[in-house]
Amino acid sequence: MATNLRGVMAALLTPFDQQQALDKASLRRLVQFNIQQGIDGLYVGGSTGEAFVQSLSEREQVLEIVAEEAKGKIKLIAHVGCVSTAESQQLAASAKRYGFDAVSAVTPFYYPFSFEEHCDHYRAIIDSADGLPMVVYNIPALSGVKLTLDQIDTLVTLPGVGALKQTSGDLYQMEQIRREHPDLVLYNGYDEIFASGLLAGADGGIGSTYNIMGWRYQGIVKALKEGDIQTAQKLQTECNKVIDLLIKTGVFRGLKTVLHYMDVVSVPLCRKPFGPVDEKYLPELKALAQQLMQERG
C-alpha cells in the first residue's frame, strides 16, 4: 500500500513574514526549490513545519498550497497530528481532498494517554484519511511518549498503517523493527545518522536539513546502493558539519536563514516564541549558503 513512499523526503519548513503571518510566496518558492534539487517527496506540517504554533486553518492553507505546487510531481505526506483527535481527523480529510499520497501523525502528547487511547486516535485518523496510508511518527524526544518495541509493533500493524517515521537515535530498535516488519516503509528521522539508519534497515528518510542539501542525502542513498560505504560516510560527515552549525544557531531558524541567503525565503523568522538567529552566526550561515549554492551548481 505504501511501497511507493520510499525515498528521501524533506520535512518542509513553513515561512512566515515580518508580521508572523504565513508567507505564501516563500512557501511556493521553497516547494519548487525542493523539487528542483531532486527530493523524492515532502513531509508537510510536521515539527520542522512548526505545526504546533499554527492554527488549524493555517495548517490547511499550507497543505493546499503545497498540493497546488507539487501534486503529481513528487510524493506528498501530510502530517495531521494534533493533541485533539477531532482536529487530526479534520486535517486528514483535508489532505485527502487536496490529493496527498499519505497522512502522518505524531503520538498524542502532553496528557498521559493510555496506549489503547493512542491506538484509537490512529484508527480515527486513518478512517478520516479515507484510504490514504498512515505514517506513524515516533519522536520520543519531543513528544515525551516512549514507545516500547511491542507498542511500535502494534501501531505499525494497525489496518491502514503503511510506514513509520522513526525519529530516534536507537539504531538497534531500528534494526529490530526492520527485522520484524520486512515490508514496512521505514524512515530514518535524525539527519545526523542518516547513513547509519539506512544500514540499520531504513528505506529512506524524512529530515529538515534536506531542505538545503537534499542532493547530499540522495548521494548517500546512491553510494550505499552501490556498496560504496566510504563515499556515504564522507557525505554524512559533510552533512554533519552543517548540522553542527545549525544546532548552535537553532535548527529551524538557521535553515530559514540559509534559505534567505539563497533567495528562497524572504524573511528568516520562525513563529514566536521562537526568536531570531543570533547575529554572531550570520556570517557563517551566509558562507554556508554560498558554499551549498556553488556545490549544487
UniProtKB/Swiss-Prot annotation:
GO terms for molecular function: N-acetylneuraminate lyase activity. The active site is at 137 (proton donor), 165 (schiff-base intermediate with substrate). NCBIfam families: nanA, PRK04147.1. It catalyses: aceneuramate = aldehydo-N-acetyl-D-mannosamine + pyruvate. Pathway: Amino-sugar metabolism; N-acetylneuraminate degradation; D-fructose 6-phosphate from N-acetylneuraminate: step 1/5. It holds the Pfam family DHDPS. This is N-acetylneuraminate lyase 1. Its EC number is 4.1.3.3. Its main location: cytoplasm. The keyword Cytoplasm applies. Homotetramer. One of its GO terms (cellular component) is cytosol. Coiled coil: none annotated. Aceneuramate binds at residues 47-48, 167, 189, 191-192, 208. The keyword Iron-sulfur does not apply. SMART domains: DHDPS. Catalyzes the reversible aldol cleavage of N-acetylneuraminic acid (sialic acid; Neu5Ac) to form pyruvate and N-acetylmannosamine (ManNAc) via a Schiff base intermediate. It is found in: Cytoplasm. Belongs to the DapA family. NanA subfamily. GO terms for biological process: carbohydrate metabolic process; N-acetylneuraminate catabolic process. Signal peptide: none annotated.
